[in-house]
């Protein structure tokens, strides 16, 4: 499986809806830039 997609899924599991859309740093969910980009591209 694609590591990026796996990381994205981990982030979505950890951060929930904060990881979806553009508001990656809302609700106390601050993600590293590489993971944010990964999640955004997922």
From Swiss-Prot:
Expressed in flowers but not in leaves, seeds or roots (at protein level). GO terms for biological process: defense response to fungus; defense response to Gram-negative bacterium; defense response to Gram-positive bacterium; killing of cells of another organism. It comes from Taraxacum officinale. Keywords: Antibiotic, Antimicrobial, Disulfide bond, Fungicide. The lineage of its organism: Eukaryota, Viridiplantae, Streptophyta, Embryophyta, Tracheophyta. It comes from the Eukaryota. Disulfide bonds. This is Antimicrobial peptide 3. Antimicrobial peptide. Active against fungal species F.oxysporum (IC(50)=5.7 uM) and A.niger (IC(50)=5.6 uM) but not against B.cinerea, F.graminearum, B.sorokinina and P.debaryanum at concentrations below 10 uM. Active against bacterial species P.syringae, B.subtilis and X.campestris. The keyword Ribosomal protein does not apply.
């Amino acid at each position: 499986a694609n590591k990026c997609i796996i990381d994205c899924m981990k982030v979505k599991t950890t951060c929930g809806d904060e990881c979806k859309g553009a508001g990656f740093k809302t609700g106390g969910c601050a993600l590293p830039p590489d993971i944010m980009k990964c999640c955004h591209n997922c």
